[in-house]
Each structure stands twice: as structure tokens, then as C-alpha cells.
Amino acid sequence: RIAASGSPDALQLIRDVMLASASIPAAFPPVMFDVEANGKRYDELHVDGGATSVMYLYPIGLDWGKLSKHLEVKGKPNVFIIRNGIWRKHWESVERSTIPIALRSMDSLMGSAVLGDAYRIYLATQRDGINYNLAYIPESFNEESSEPFDKEYMAKLFNLGFQMAKDGYTWHTVPPGYDVGSK
């Protein structure tokens, strides 16, 4: 809707929405939006799209068949998901203190949300006749980040992804742990 609105502010609004979605709380500032509701103006602060959905394709209630006919989509569409993370978190000892326990709990919660979103998107693509393709960091990558936004770690991760793409990455066609035999 934003892109099709014809508004001269549409491009900047899309950029702001994407910036807000990537604004990790406490790491990046929230993005302020001026909004109007029932004739009254408000300021809204938006942060981290992952707080509501880690991965998103389209609303689950969308009638893809009807939409694809309207858009005259030819052939079977492809969805490509690139997950910047390892699926399985390794066991980790945690200090018996509130903050470390809370941080590990949040990490576990995020991992569950990512997997749940991958399953939801997979099931939607199967229902709607769309090819599902997933890439993620292999478990063989065992480097550890020493701090948030660790440049050395990010360079190693980039080099791994570059080499995997160069070698001809084989996309996963189902989410990790999904039993296609139990449909």
C-alpha cells in the first residue's frame, strides 16, 4: 500500500519502516513515526520487527491463488529465506544470576520464534503451491562472537557465506526438524 500510494513520502516511509524493523532495543534507537488516528495526531516509537514476527512472508489468511491470478503470476513462485543464524543452539552453562538467566531465556525464546516462523512460512508455501528455499549457517561454523557487532566474527561469517554461494549452495526445501513424512 505504501509503495502504491503515490505519496512523495512513500520511499522515505518504507526506509523508516525497514530501519525500525531492524532497530534492536538498546543497540539502536527506535524510529519515530507521526501518525493520525480519529483526527488526532500521535507520535509512535517503533523497534525490532522480530518482537512480533522474526520472519514474515504474507498474512496467513491471504488468498494467494486469487492474488496470483490477479497479478497474472506465471509458473510456480519461489520463496528464498536467508537465516543469519544457526538453528540449533548448543547447550550452554549459565551463571546462577538473574541477568544471565534472562539473557539465555530470551535467546531460547528467539530461537523458538525463528523455528516457528520457518514452519508457518513452510506450511503456507505448501498450501499455496510456492517453492520453499531456506539457507542458514551450518552447525560446522563454530566461531564465537566476542562482542555485539564483532567485526572479525562478521568477516568470518561473510567469508563462509561467500564461499558457500560460490560452491553452489544447496537450498533446504523444508525447515530443520520438519518431518515431511507426517503430513
Language model features by range: what are they?
Residues 1-183:
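Patatin-like phospholipase
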